[in-house]
Amino acid sequence: MAETDERSLRDLLLESADDLEHIVKMIVDTLINRDKSVMLKNGETVTNIIKLFDSKQDSIKTLLKRVPEFQEREQLIRTLEAHVEKRDEVIQQLETNLKSCEVALTRSCFHANQKLKQMKEAELRPVNSEMLIKLAHQISKHNSVSAPLTWQMGDPSRPFPQEHEFRAGHLLNSKVQSTGPQLLPGKNVAQRPLITSPSASSSNGGTAPIRTVGTPLINSAPTGDFSPRTGFGTDEPPPIQQQVLRGATPNEKQWQNPGVSGATSTQSPYNRVSQSPSSSPNVKLKITGLPNRPGGIDQVQDVRDVEQMSSDSSNSSDSSDDEGASKKTGSSNK
């Protein structure tokens, strides 16, 4: 009966315990009230009731033998439930990580699409690198970023790197340098010219100074205290600065020094030597926006001499007038 029944072991044990209790009550009632017992009147005997008690007791023992099997099964169920809870925690953590990865991927895809769009727009509208550097210089000069200390007004070179300097740099020529011969820095590399820019040549036919790899921008370190007016350790300002202090506005032409038999000297701010000049140079200026005057500095000097002569003649005429007036007053007094 217990094997074919689909009920649980707990229900079967409770039912068997109730039946056994009822049988025990019947036996006790039969033994106490033998004359008034209903079971005895119906033909039942105490022996049959005791046999029924024994059979019910055997069924309970059979059910109790199945208890360890059910206990092992229950322990296995609880163990499996604990493992399921752990797996649930792992799954929840994995779900959280997957969601964060999804958000990161979505954000990365969004930024990548924006970058691709910007790259396409940049390809459609290319910009010269030198123009960008000029604009960056215009922006940076308002943020306490100054030009080199050796740069002066009228210098054709710019205080920022130009496009040809970028093309001749190490970043662009890294592959060429890696395939070429290995040169020791500071020895063989310094002897090789790096920049020869035809655009940097002056208007009078001079060539721009050539920079070499491994050589600094300034040939010699300045000595002495720096002064905004005279530079490093100089008693007098350089010739160019003297002309600037006088109010001149030089262009990009080369400065000429008559003391060197008419030869022009091309100077760069990077090769400037902080020395006091022996004589003040004559400067030929060409200011845009003003009419061209015939002649040079000599005619200007002649004009100044004529003005001085006219001023002397006016002074002499004034003195003669004063003498004539004094004579007239003397004669009237007489």
From Swiss-Prot:
Q: Single GO molecular-function term?
A: transcription coregulator activity
The Polar residues compositionally biased stretches are: 194-206, 251-282
Positions the record marks as coiled coil are 71-100
Swiss-Prot/TrEMBL GO biological process terms: regulation of transcription by RNA polymerase II
Pfam families with a match to the protein in the record: Med4 (PF10018)
The record's listing under InterPro entries reads:
Mediator_Med4
Places the protein is found:
Nucleus
Could you confirm whether the keyword ATP-binding appears in this record? no
Disordered as annotated region, ranges:
193-334
The disulfide bonds in this chain are: none
- Identify one Gene Ontology CC term for this UniProt entry: mediator complex
Transcription is among the record's keywords: yes
Q: Which UniProt keywords apply?
A: Activator, Coiled coil, Nucleus, Transcription, Transcription regulation
This molecule's function is given as: Component of the Mediator complex, a coactivator involved in the regulated transcription of nearly all RNA polymerase II-dependent genes. Mediator functions as a bridge to convey information from gene-specific regulatory proteins to the basal RNA polymerase II transcription machinery. Mediator is recruited to promoters by direct interactions with regulatory proteins and serves as a scaffold for the assembly of a functional preinitiation complex with RNA polymerase II and the general transcription factors.
Q: How is the subunit organization of this protein annotated in UniProt?
A: Component of the Mediator complex.
Q: Which family does it belong to?
A: Belongs to the Mediator complex subunit 4 family.
This one is known as: Mediator of RNA polymerase II transcription subunit 4
Give the originating organism.
Caenorhabditis elegans
